Amino acid sequence: RLRIGILLSKYSEYQVDYISSESEIGKLIEEADLIIGAGITAYEGVLRRKPVIVVGDYGLGGLVTPDTFRKHYNNRFRGKINGVRNESFSLENLEKEIYKSFNLTFQELQMMSNQTITLQNI
């Protein structure tokens, strides 16, 4: 949490929240502009049409895009595709992914949300 806070400190309009209980997830995801997380948090973020950067037990998976969505979904949003457990990453790389997230369009977010719903029903 502290590292991300430092990374984003030059942007005073951003508020970084750490979700500590499952009961908070839905409400905070709905209010968020960007989700950084793994597993169900990342999944819910995609489902709710939010930009998602996957950071998990397997390192930095990066921004979920229409091109990477299926790989992240199949990897259960656990981190880097084909990564190793507890893989480290640089804050500079996370920062690059944050900047890339600003370029996702609503149509791209909607398409990934729809794919999530379709895959749920298979």
How does the language model describe each region?
Residues 1-10, 14:
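Conserved catalytic-core segment of nucleotide-activated headgroup transferases in glycan assembly
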Residues 2, 16-28, 40, 58:
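Conserved active-site histidine-acidic residue motif and adjacent donor-binding/catalytic loop
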Residues 4-7, 28, 44, 48-50:
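A short acidic, amphipathic alpha-helical/loop segment
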Residues 19-26, 97-101, 121:
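Extended, folded domain segments that form the structural surfaces/walls around functional sites
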Residues 32:
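An anion/phosphate-binding loop that grips the pyrophosphate of nucleotide cofactors and donors
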Residues 43-108:
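Catalytic binding pocket for nucleotide-activated donors in carbohydrate/polymer assembly enzymes
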Residues 98-99, 106-122:
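A short N-terminal helical cap/helix-turn-helix that marks the beginning
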